[in-house]
């Protein structure tokens, strides 16, 4: 990297640090931002000036004085850009369609709705997002959660919506609309959402096992803020685990999983495998199928194979909508491109 390129990269990192600091507070003084981002006061002043000129940052009223000179306060401009968060939902018992939320840069929900659809075609998804962006020109980034696998270029492999197989909404929408688009597996978004919504004062890891009614199960893991996606982003596809016993074939076991039949042994096996391979601090058991499961039955089974001192904290939570949306928003905001 050239000296000029290195300086440019450093500047972008510093701008990102300032934005991240402002995302997580209502306002801050220049001195507070400089200290938090480990910048000199002069560098912080110059960068804030550029961000103010671009509209990213707002100058607020002076802070109350404690006898000295009052300090100017700064805040992120929540309406500099809006983010469209959506995911494809498919559950034979509940509902199928597209769940969406539009947020400002602070994460405040501006609009939320569910659009029922029996099937989702590529043109449906493209038209739907295009209409949303046309209705709100401030939408500059879109995060799309998929019930299935997405590759590193954004192409979809979905069993829930076969018509989307091979479709790359990221490529199509970025070319057509000139906005930032990310696509990701549902459990990768969701596990990151759990991580964001369960902050800790030290690095930690968590895994999420998701058992919906009438759909195949999935899993996601975050270690120290990093999602474990795997080399081809196939990590977490529980349907590929050898969840069989002496009386059931693989096909029969998968059918049981999808139809919610005799689900406890499958959850127990998946939990043991997750703990043995990933050793998370926290293991979330989620999805509507957990409503009829006792947490104690899973824990007792795990203790038969996992030493007590290596057992995670177990938490059970049926609904994951808020975590899913939080993960989509957080990762899409990270990907949003700025002029400065």
Outline where the language-model segments fall.
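Short glycine-aspartate micro-motif
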Residues: 83-87, 141-143, 205-210, 218
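Hydrophobic beta-strand positions
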Residues: 102, 149, 220-221
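Glycine-rich phosphate-binding loop and adjoining helix at the ATP-binding site
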Residues: 109-197, 202, 297-305
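ATP-binding/phosphotransfer module of carbohydrate and carboxylate kinases, centering on a glycine-rich
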Residues: 1-112, 120-131, 138, 245-340
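Glycine/GP-enriched mid-protein hinge/lid loop-to-helix segment characteristic of carbohydrate kinases
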Residues: 112, 176-275
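Short glycine-rich anion-binding loops that position phosphate/pyrophosphate groups of nucleotides
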Residues: 147-149, 214, 289-290
């Amino acid at each position: 990297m050239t000296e000029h390129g290195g300086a440019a990269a450093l500047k972008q990192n510093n701008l990102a640090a300032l934005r991240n600091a402002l995302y997580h507070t209502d306002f801050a003084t220049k001195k507070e931002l400089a200290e938090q981002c480990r910048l000199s006061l002069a560098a912080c002043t110059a960068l804030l000036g550029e961000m103010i000129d671009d509209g990213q940052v707002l100058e607020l009223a002076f802070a109350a004085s404690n006898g000295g000179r009052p300090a100017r306060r700064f805040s992120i401009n929540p309406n500099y850009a809006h983010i469209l968060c959506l995911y494809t939902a498919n559950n034979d018992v509940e509902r199928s369609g597209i769940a969406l939320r539009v947020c400002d840069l602070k994460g405040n929900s501006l609009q939320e709705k569910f659009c029922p659809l029996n099937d989702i075609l590529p043109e449906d998804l493209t038209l739907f997002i295009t209409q949303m962006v046309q209705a709100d020109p401030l939408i500059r980034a879109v995060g799309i959660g998929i019930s299935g696998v997405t590759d590193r270029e954004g192409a979809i492999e979905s069993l829930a919506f076969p018509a989307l197989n091979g479709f790359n909404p990221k490529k199509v929408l970025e070319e057509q609309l000139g906005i930032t688009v990310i696509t990701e597996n549902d459990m990768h978004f969701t596990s990151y959402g759990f991580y964001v919504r369960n902050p800790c004062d030290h690095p930690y890891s968590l895994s999420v096992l998701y058992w919906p009614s009438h759909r195949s199960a999935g899993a996601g893991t975050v270690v120290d803020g990093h999602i474990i996606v795997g080399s081809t982003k196939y990590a977490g596809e529980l349907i590929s685990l050898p969840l069989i016993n002496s009386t059931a074939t693989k096909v029969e076991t998968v059918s049981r999983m999808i139809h919610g039949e005799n689900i406890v042994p499958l959850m127990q096996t998946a939990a043991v495998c997750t703990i043995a391979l990933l050793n998370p601090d926290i293991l979330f058991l989620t999805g509507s199928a957990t409503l009829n499961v006792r947490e104690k039955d899973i824990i007792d089974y795990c203790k038969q194979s996992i030493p007590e001192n290596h057992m995670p904290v177990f938490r059970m939570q049926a609904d994951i909508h808020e975590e899913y949306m939080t993960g989509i928003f957080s990762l899409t905001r990270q990907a949003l491109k700025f002029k400065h």
